[in-house]
Amino acid sequence: MKKTLLGSLILLAFAGNVQADINTETSGKVTFFGKVVENTCKVKTEHKNLSVVLNDVGKNSLSTKVNTAMPTPFTITLQNCDPTTANGTANKANKVGLYFYSWKNVDKENNFTLKNEQTTADYATNVNIQLMESNGTKAISVVGKETEDFMHTNNNGVALNQTHPNNTHISGSTQLTTGTNELPLHFIAQYYATNKATAGKVQSSVDFQIAYE
């Protein structure tokens, strides 16, 4: 019994020493921050799964990289956004928008536009879909698996915290006002040339979630 106990104590001591000897040059730490708010907006039922059809366009309109064509408006409507229905004030958001993301077809090399998902023999090449804010001038960078601006390096060992919110990817951000039941959020979709386009079909898709500020 004494030998067994002694062996266990030696083993524990050894394990403790191993744990204490982790090389700081080959290890690190990632800290995650977030916040849950009281707001209760919902996506209007008929807007949860939308189809947006862009008019046909001639390939000469997309003959050069970054050419765009056929800006097409679409709207996603939220409901139950009256801020007075949210409890308290400390954890209540003032603005709401949408967070667009896709883990499979975001094209980092072409301004985070959406790749053409068509795989039929007659699909267009060098053509993506770009999302824009409703003003038609600000591009939306769809979040993908290679998006990096959520990460922040800790400066001099001081961790960033929730006083550094990341709202870079909230699109259509709109002020919440009392009495708001339905809240339409407006956006634009357009063709985007990644090089000289060829004729054919174009299809892409993006996921979204409600996001608050």
Swiss-Prot record:
Keyword Protease, does the record have it? no
Q: Which SUPFAM superfamilies match?
A: Bacterial adhesins
Q: Which GO terms describe its cellular component?
A: pilus
Disulfide linkages recorded for this protein, renumbered to the chain, are: 41-81
Keywords of this entry: Disulfide bond, Fimbrium, Signal
Q: What Gene3D superfamilies does its record include?
A: Fimbrial-type adhesion domain
Keyword check for Membrane, yes or no: no
Q: Where in the cell is it found?
A: Fimbrium
The stretch of residues making up the signal peptide is: 1-20
**InterPro entries, sorted:** Adhesion_dom_fimbrial (IPR000259), Adhesion_dom_fimbrial_sf (IPR036937), Adhesion_dom_sf (IPR008966), Bact_Fimbrial_Adh_Pro (IPR050263)
UniProt GO BP: cell adhesion involved in single-species biofilm formation
Domain of life, per lineage: Bacteria
The record describes the protein's role as: Mediates adherence to oropharyngeal epithelial cells. Helps the airway colonization process.
Q: Which family does it belong to?
A: Belongs to the fimbrial protein family.
User: What is the recorded name of this protein?
Assistant: Major fimbrial subunit
